[in-house]
């Protein structure tokens, strides 16, 4: 009983002195002192924290300890991945931790580093396990376990409709997505979309988190688009990563493009032009999953400042994509999405060919693809998801499109998404607000996982 009272009294004193960062003991009980200090060290979980004797009286009836914070350099960082990534690229991942010191702020700094690599690397969606270890007596190292998730898939859909008596219109889509094919953490995307024979789009993207020597990130984009047989637009983008931290990644680069109006397009007021611009991008990604996210957010902001052969002054263009997932209950979560795009030529009309096209599965569901055209558009979306069944997601959504040339466009609908080891199936049924139910659009996407 006496021991319990002493321990409770000591804990009370420790708790009181803890706020002042000094600890006083009333007796030279070495076992009690060791247990108390070990407990405090365990609670704070700081390797850099030690306790040293500050003072004591002649009879050892009052002993005072004070915290001592030291600083250690990390000599070695070991990165372990569950996927096959080349060591030369894992070394670049390790560099994210090279400036860490084991000191008073090490726990906070390690948490920031965890957020940094989740933001930078699209294939890391869960928090890495990080442990500090000792080797060769006095040297310290970090062991980082990353859970890499790469998605490789391919889909191809084709169809046809008889537009006239002896003429058929074809449509289709090819979507090829490859990740870490060469063990370099790269991402390759190829898309072909044909709404009909006079509306087609080809797109190629290459994402490299690191180049072999310099280690900087790179994004390359090439785009070809035929729009209603009025004009052909070609566009090329190159962006390099300038800065990466726990709050986001910053890119800068160059954009160049051209618009070639057809004879039919010129008759309808479309004008050929060439343009070039400086491009800037900010990206942040904390989603817990790239296919079926439940929590986290994703932000992408792009800005162009450049010149066009049809404009006397500079033009500015920006695009913003944002999505945030909020868990409501264990199996239900809400999602808010926001898409906006804007172009403005100072003291000039931007022209129809440079306006923003929107409508369809990726921008205002329930309407035909690229049905609308405007200098700016913003589309907020609210979704509610049910994910009580593993690898299965159902949703209802409401979205509205705001633009300069049209009244607000509303749509609503529901959908299901199913993931198996071999495929991903996504079906959405979307209805424009003013349309009867039989004019709804069914958006179907089938991906074969490789």
Regions picked out by a protein language model, each given a short descriptive name:
Residues 27, 93-97, 297-450:
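C-terminal transmembrane beta-barrel domains of outer membrane proteins
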Residues 1-2:
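N-terminal secretory signal peptides that target proteins for export/translocation
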Residues 20-162, 174-175, 189-207, 316-321, ...:
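Periplasmic polypeptide-binding modules associated with outer-membrane biogenesis and secretion
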Residues 6-14:
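Sec-dependent N-terminal signal peptides
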Residues 81-85, 270, 293, 415:
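A generic short alpha-helical patch detector that favors 3-5-residue windows
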Residues 72, 181, 211, 343, ...:
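Hydrophobic pocket-lining residues within nucleotide cofactor-binding pockets
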Residues 104-300, 356-361, 370-376, 392-394, ...:
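Gram-negative/organellar outer-membrane beta-barrel architecture
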Residues 16-18:
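Sec/Tat signal peptide C-region and signal peptidase I cleavage site
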């Amino acid at each position: 009983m006496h021991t319990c009272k002493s321990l409770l009294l000591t804990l009370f004193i420790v708790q009181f002195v803890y706020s002042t960062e000094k600890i006083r003991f009333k007796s030279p009980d070495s076992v009690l002192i060791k247990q108390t200090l070990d407990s405090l060290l365990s609670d704070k979980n700081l390797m850099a924290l030690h306790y040293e004797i500050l003072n004591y009286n002649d009879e050892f009836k009052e002993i005072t300890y004070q915290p001592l914070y030291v600083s250690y350099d990390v000599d070695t960082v070991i990165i372990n991945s569950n996927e096959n990534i080349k060591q030369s690229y894992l070394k670049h991942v390790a560099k994210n931790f090279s400036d860490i010191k084991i000191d008073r702020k090490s726990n906070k700094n390690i948490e920031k580093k965890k957020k940094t690599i989740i933001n930078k690397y699209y294939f890391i969606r869960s928090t890495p396990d990080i442990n500090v270890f000792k080797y060769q007596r006095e040297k310290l190292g970090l062991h980082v376990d990353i859970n890499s998730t790469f998605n490789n898939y391919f889909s191809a859909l084709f169809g046809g409709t008889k537009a006239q008596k002896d003429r058929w219109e074809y449509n289709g889509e090819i979507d090829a997505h490859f990740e870490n094919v060469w063990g370099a953490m790269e991402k390759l995307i190829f898309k072909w979309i044909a709404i009909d024979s006079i509306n087609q789009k080809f797109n190629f993207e290459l994402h490299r988190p690191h180049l072999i020597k310099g280690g900087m990130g790179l994004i390359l984009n090439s785009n070809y688009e035929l729009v209603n047989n009025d004009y052909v637009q070609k566009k090329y983008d190159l962006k390099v990563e300038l800065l990466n931290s726990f709050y986001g990644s910053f890119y800068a680069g160059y954009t160049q493009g051209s618009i070639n109006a057809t004879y039919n397009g010129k008759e309808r007021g479309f004008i050929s032009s060439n343009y070039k611009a400086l491009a800037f991008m900010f990206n942040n990604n904390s989603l817990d999953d790239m296919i079926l996210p439940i929590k986290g957010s994703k932000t992408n902001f792009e800005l162009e400042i450049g010149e066009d052969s049809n404009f006397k002054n500079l033009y500015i263009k920006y695009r913003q994509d944002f999505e945030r997932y909020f868990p409501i209950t264990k199996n239900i979560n809400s999602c808010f999405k926001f898409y906006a795009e804007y172009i403005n030529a100072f003291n000039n009309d931007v022209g129809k060919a440079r306006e923003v096209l929107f409508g369809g599965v990726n921008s205002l569901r329930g309407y035909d693809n690229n049905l609308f055209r405007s200098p700016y558009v913003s589309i907020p979306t609210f979704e509610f998801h049910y994910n009580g069944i593993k690898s299965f997601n159902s949703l209802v959504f409401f979205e509205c499109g705001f633009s300069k040339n049209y009244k607000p466009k509303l749509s609503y609908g529901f959908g299901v998404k199913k993931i198996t080891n071999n495929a991903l199936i996504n079906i959405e049924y979307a209805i424009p607000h003013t349309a009867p139910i039989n004019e709804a659009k069914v958006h179907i996407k089938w991906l074969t996982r490789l």
